[in-house]
Amino acid sequence: TDILAHLRDWQICASIDGTGAVGEYIRTGLKWEQFLQNYKDAQAIQTNDRLMRLDFTLTLPGLFEVENMFWLSKELNTQILAKVTFAFSPDIVMSPLSLPRHILEPYVSSVLERIKPHADKHQQPLVDVLEQLLNRPTLEEQWPDEYADGMRRGKERILTLESIRTQPITMAEILKQNLEIYEWWNRIEVKN
Protein backbone atom coordinates (compact mmCIF):
# COMPACT_ATOMS: atom_id res chain seq x y z
CA THR A 1 0.00 0.00 0.00
CA ASP A 2 2.95 2.36 0.50
CA ILE A 3 3.50 2.32 -3.29
CA LEU A 4 -0.18 2.24 -4.34
CA ALA A 5 -0.93 5.40 -2.39
CA HIS A 6 1.38 7.33 -4.74
CA LEU A 7 -0.01 5.95 -8.01
CA ARG A 8 -2.74 7.81 -9.84
CA ASP A 9 -4.22 4.79 -11.63
CA TRP A 10 -4.08 1.22 -10.43
CA GLN A 11 -6.29 -1.84 -10.34
CA ILE A 12 -5.99 -5.21 -8.59
CA CYS A 13 -7.72 -8.46 -9.51
CA ALA A 14 -6.69 -10.73 -6.66
CA SER A 15 -6.64 -14.29 -7.96
CA ILE A 16 -7.99 -16.49 -5.18
CA ASP A 17 -9.50 -19.98 -5.10
CA GLY A 18 -10.90 -20.18 -1.59
CA THR A 19 -10.50 -19.05 1.99
CA GLY A 20 -8.50 -20.41 4.90
CA ALA A 21 -6.97 -23.88 4.72
CA VAL A 22 -8.91 -24.87 1.59
CA GLY A 23 -7.68 -21.79 -0.27
CA GLU A 24 -4.14 -22.60 0.89
CA TYR A 25 -4.57 -26.21 -0.31
CA ILE A 26 -5.70 -25.15 -3.78
CA ARG A 27 -3.06 -22.46 -4.21
CA THR A 28 0.25 -23.51 -2.72
CA GLY A 29 2.02 -20.57 -1.12
CA LEU A 30 -1.11 -18.67 -0.17
CA LYS A 31 -1.09 -17.43 3.40
CA TRP A 32 -4.77 -16.70 3.89
CA GLU A 33 -4.61 -14.32 6.85
CA GLN A 34 -1.81 -12.30 5.25
CA PHE A 35 -3.68 -12.16 1.94
CA LEU A 36 -6.85 -10.95 3.66
CA GLN A 37 -5.00 -8.24 5.60
CA ASN A 38 -3.17 -7.07 2.48
CA TYR A 39 -6.47 -6.89 0.59
CA LYS A 40 -8.09 -4.84 3.35
CA ASP A 41 -5.06 -2.53 3.55
CA ALA A 42 -5.27 -1.84 -0.18
CA GLN A 43 -9.03 -1.29 0.05
CA ALA A 44 -8.40 1.42 2.63
CA ILE A 45 -6.66 3.56 -0.01
CA GLN A 46 -8.82 2.77 -3.04
CA THR A 47 -10.78 5.69 -4.41
CA ASN A 48 -13.64 3.62 -5.87
CA ASP A 49 -14.89 0.06 -5.54
CA ARG A 50 -13.82 -0.95 -9.06
CA LEU A 51 -10.12 -0.75 -8.25
CA MET A 52 -10.07 -4.05 -6.38
CA ARG A 53 -11.79 -7.32 -7.21
CA LEU A 54 -11.60 -10.92 -6.07
CA ASP A 55 -10.92 -13.20 -9.05
CA PHE A 56 -12.28 -16.61 -8.00
CA THR A 57 -11.43 -19.74 -9.98
CA LEU A 58 -13.94 -22.47 -9.16
CA THR A 59 -12.26 -25.84 -8.60
CA LEU A 60 -13.57 -29.13 -7.25
CA PRO A 61 -12.39 -28.39 -3.68
CA GLY A 62 -13.42 -24.79 -4.27
CA LEU A 63 -17.05 -25.90 -4.53
CA PHE A 64 -16.92 -25.94 -0.75
CA GLU A 65 -15.62 -22.36 -0.75
CA VAL A 66 -18.31 -20.75 -2.90
CA GLU A 67 -20.35 -19.59 0.06
CA ASN A 68 -17.28 -18.35 1.95
CA MET A 69 -16.18 -16.37 -1.10
CA PHE A 70 -19.70 -15.03 -1.62
CA TRP A 71 -19.93 -13.76 1.96
CA LEU A 72 -16.37 -12.42 1.85
CA SER A 73 -17.36 -10.35 -1.18
CA LYS A 74 -20.34 -9.00 0.77
CA GLU A 75 -18.24 -8.30 3.87
CA LEU A 76 -15.57 -6.46 1.88
CA ASN A 77 -18.12 -4.82 -0.44
CA THR A 78 -15.98 -5.93 -3.37
CA GLN A 79 -16.86 -7.52 -6.68
CA ILE A 80 -16.10 -11.17 -7.19
CA LEU A 81 -15.23 -12.24 -10.72
CA ALA A 82 -15.64 -15.96 -11.32
CA LYS A 83 -14.61 -18.66 -13.75
CA VAL A 84 -14.37 -22.46 -13.77
CA THR A 85 -11.15 -24.50 -13.95
CA PHE A 86 -10.50 -25.47 -17.56
CA ALA A 87 -11.52 -29.03 -18.37
CA PHE A 88 -9.78 -29.84 -21.63
CA SER A 89 -9.25 -33.56 -21.02
CA PRO A 90 -10.97 -36.27 -18.95
CA ASP A 91 -8.29 -36.28 -16.23
CA ILE A 92 -8.79 -32.76 -14.87
CA VAL A 93 -10.05 -33.88 -11.48
CA MET A 94 -9.55 -30.36 -10.06
CA SER A 95 -12.49 -29.18 -12.17
CA PRO A 96 -15.95 -29.26 -10.60
CA LEU A 97 -17.03 -30.76 -13.94
CA SER A 98 -15.21 -33.93 -12.93
CA LEU A 99 -18.24 -34.73 -10.78
CA PRO A 100 -20.98 -36.80 -12.38
CA ARG A 101 -24.10 -34.80 -13.25
CA HIS A 102 -26.23 -36.56 -10.59
CA ILE A 103 -23.86 -35.27 -7.90
CA LEU A 104 -22.86 -31.88 -9.35
CA GLU A 105 -26.34 -30.60 -10.12
CA PRO A 106 -27.99 -31.01 -6.70
CA TYR A 107 -24.92 -29.68 -4.89
CA VAL A 108 -24.62 -26.54 -7.03
CA SER A 109 -28.39 -26.01 -6.95
CA SER A 110 -28.40 -26.13 -3.15
CA VAL A 111 -25.58 -23.56 -2.99
CA LEU A 112 -27.47 -21.32 -5.40
CA GLU A 113 -30.61 -21.56 -3.26
CA ARG A 114 -28.65 -20.27 -0.28
CA ILE A 115 -26.73 -17.43 -1.94
CA LYS A 116 -28.77 -16.16 -4.89
CA PRO A 117 -31.39 -14.31 -2.80
CA HIS A 118 -28.58 -12.31 -1.15
CA ALA A 119 -26.61 -11.47 -4.30
CA ASP A 120 -26.07 -7.89 -5.40
CA LYS A 121 -24.04 -6.53 -8.32
CA HIS A 122 -20.81 -7.57 -6.59
CA GLN A 123 -21.74 -11.28 -6.29
CA GLN A 124 -23.83 -11.67 -9.46
CA PRO A 125 -20.85 -12.86 -11.56
CA LEU A 126 -20.42 -15.79 -9.15
CA VAL A 127 -24.13 -16.64 -9.31
CA ASP A 128 -23.96 -16.48 -13.12
CA VAL A 129 -21.01 -18.90 -13.26
CA LEU A 130 -22.79 -21.37 -10.99
CA GLU A 131 -25.93 -21.22 -13.13
CA GLN A 132 -23.85 -21.73 -16.27
CA LEU A 133 -22.09 -24.68 -14.63
CA LEU A 134 -25.43 -26.49 -14.45
CA ASN A 135 -25.69 -26.31 -18.24
CA ARG A 136 -22.15 -27.29 -19.14
CA PRO A 137 -21.32 -30.89 -20.03
CA THR A 138 -19.49 -32.78 -17.31
CA LEU A 139 -16.27 -34.65 -18.08
CA GLU A 140 -18.24 -37.89 -17.95
CA GLU A 141 -20.63 -36.53 -20.61
CA GLN A 142 -17.82 -35.19 -22.80
CA TRP A 143 -15.61 -38.28 -22.61
CA PRO A 144 -17.83 -41.24 -21.65
CA ASP A 145 -15.31 -43.86 -22.82
CA GLU A 146 -12.28 -42.21 -21.20
CA TYR A 147 -13.86 -40.80 -18.03
CA ALA A 148 -13.06 -43.62 -15.57
CA ASP A 149 -9.43 -43.85 -16.66
CA GLY A 150 -9.15 -40.04 -16.70
CA MET A 151 -10.44 -39.80 -13.12
CA ARG A 152 -7.97 -42.48 -12.04
CA ARG A 153 -5.05 -40.60 -13.63
CA GLY A 154 -6.24 -37.29 -12.21
CA LYS A 155 -6.61 -38.69 -8.70
CA GLU A 156 -3.17 -40.32 -8.93
CA ARG A 157 -1.71 -36.92 -9.88
CA ILE A 158 -3.41 -35.26 -6.89
CA LEU A 159 -2.18 -37.97 -4.51
CA THR A 160 1.37 -37.64 -5.87
CA LEU A 161 1.30 -33.87 -5.35
CA GLU A 162 -0.09 -34.30 -1.85
CA SER A 163 2.80 -36.64 -0.99
CA ILE A 164 5.24 -33.87 -1.95
CA ARG A 165 3.44 -30.90 -0.44
CA THR A 166 3.42 -30.13 3.26
CA GLN A 167 -0.15 -28.96 3.67
CA PRO A 168 -2.20 -30.02 6.67
CA ILE A 169 -5.27 -31.09 4.66
CA THR A 170 -5.91 -33.34 1.68
CA MET A 171 -8.43 -33.44 -1.13
CA ALA A 172 -10.22 -36.30 0.63
CA GLU A 173 -10.55 -34.27 3.83
CA ILE A 174 -11.97 -31.32 1.92
CA LEU A 175 -14.43 -33.52 0.02
CA LYS A 176 -15.65 -35.10 3.29
CA GLN A 177 -17.84 -32.03 3.68
CA ASN A 178 -20.33 -33.75 1.37
CA LEU A 179 -20.82 -37.49 1.82
CA GLU A 180 -21.89 -38.14 -1.77
CA ILE A 181 -18.89 -36.30 -3.21
CA TYR A 182 -16.55 -38.00 -0.73
CA GLU A 183 -17.90 -41.45 -1.63
CA TRP A 184 -17.49 -40.65 -5.35
CA TRP A 185 -13.84 -39.70 -4.68
CA ASN A 186 -13.22 -42.90 -2.75
CA ARG A 187 -14.68 -45.02 -5.56
CA ILE A 188 -12.02 -43.76 -7.98
CA GLU A 189 -9.55 -46.63 -7.94
CA VAL A 190 -5.88 -45.80 -8.32
CA LYS A 191 -3.02 -48.08 -9.30
CA ASN A 192 -0.63 -49.05 -6.52
Language-model segment annotations:
Residues L58-L63, L81-E113, Q123, V127-E140, ...:
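Flexible glycine/acidic-rich beta-alpha junction loops that bind and position SAM and/or redox cofactors
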Residues T1-A87:
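Radical SAM/AdoMet-radical enzyme domain recognition
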